[in-house]
Regions:
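Iron-sulfur (Fe-S) cluster-binding segments and ferredoxin-like electron-carrier domains
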Residues: 1-17
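Residues forming the flavin
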Residues: 12-184
Length: 184
């Protein structure tokens, strides 16, 4: 008796805050292996793969469709859960590893996979996330004011709703709110 569960979220937050205060040292990188790798998406998978590949000596470029890197870490997690400064510090650390980040590039439209291989990339990692919601097919789900979790969080986080009333967010809020599912 007398034992309590560990609060993983609080521990992760402590470590992130500590690293933010103390600064992250850029490790020695592996010997260059002369292989270019393109990473599609700058969410958790893309950032992690990019950092690991850079540490192994690969030349890495991230292609991000949005105007800022971070993917779901940026648009899907509210400021009170993941302060943007922590994400910005992590992205800067990855840049210090030599990773290049190109934003506003939609792979498949702006540039194709064949274009990437023609540019000398030996491999492509697709960390594109799960951006498409699953709808239930219920009457009214296509009406104004009905949002998927990702759409709602994107509008909140990318349109600065957390800085309300300085910024007004184009989200229709009704008197009644229904939340279906427990993911986001």
């Amino acid at each position: 008796g007398g034992y309590q569960s560990a609060s993983i979220g609080a521990l992760e937050r402590f470590v992130a805050d500590y690293a933010l205060q103390k600064g992250l040292e850029t490790p020695d990188l592996g010997e260059s292996v002369d292989a270019k790798v393109a990473v599609i998406g700058s969410g958790p998978a893309g950032l992690t793969a990019s950092a690991d590949l850079a540490r192994l000596g690969h030349e890495v470029t991230i292609y991000e469709a949005l105007h800022k890197p971070g993917g779901v870490l940026l648009y899907g997690i509210p400021e009170f859960r993941l302060p943007k400064q922590i994400l910005e510090t992590e992205v800067e650390y990855i840049r210090k590893l030599g990773v290049k980040i190109q934003t506003n590039v939609v792979v498949g439209k702006t540039v194709t996979l064949n274009d990437l291989f023609d540019q000398g990339y030996k491999a492509v990692f697709a960390g594109i996330g799960a951006g498409s919601p699953y709808f239930l097919g219920v009457p009214g789900e296509n009406l104004n004011g009905v949002y998927s979790a990702n759409e709602f969080l994107t509008r909140i986080n990318l349109m600065n709703a957390y800085l309300f009333p300085k910024y007004d967010t184009p989200i229709i809020l009704g008197e009644t709110v229904v939340i279906m599912g427990g993911g986001n």
